[in-house]
Amino acid sequence: ESPLAVFVDYAHTDDALRRVLTLMRATVAARGKGRLWCVFGCGGDRDRTKRPKMGALAAELSDVAIITSDNPRRENPRTIIDEILAGVRPEWRSRVIIEEDRALAIARAV
């Protein structure tokens, strides 16, 4: 059995992210070991109101959340990341890593 399990999902709303992280939390618990890492970002030129909600969910439901860039389109990637971070409660901030470069964010998680 591999010590690492990787799941890829296209959760692009707060409801979808909540569902996938809840399922993954149960999967980690069933394995009896490991931690849940979430690597995600929000696309640019899309609904900005979901960004802080998704940041809050990722920080709350993951052991570690890596916030990264995800197709910023015409927006500044750092602005998107800052809007995601705005939803992270101070007590969860220590669980969050910022890595704007998506490839580096994934490498850091695995």
Tell where the protein language model's regions lie, with residue ranges.
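C-terminal helical cap/extension that packs against the catalytic core
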Residues: G55-A109
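Nucleotide phosphate-binding/pyrophosphate-handling subdomain across enzymes
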Residues: E1-V64, A86
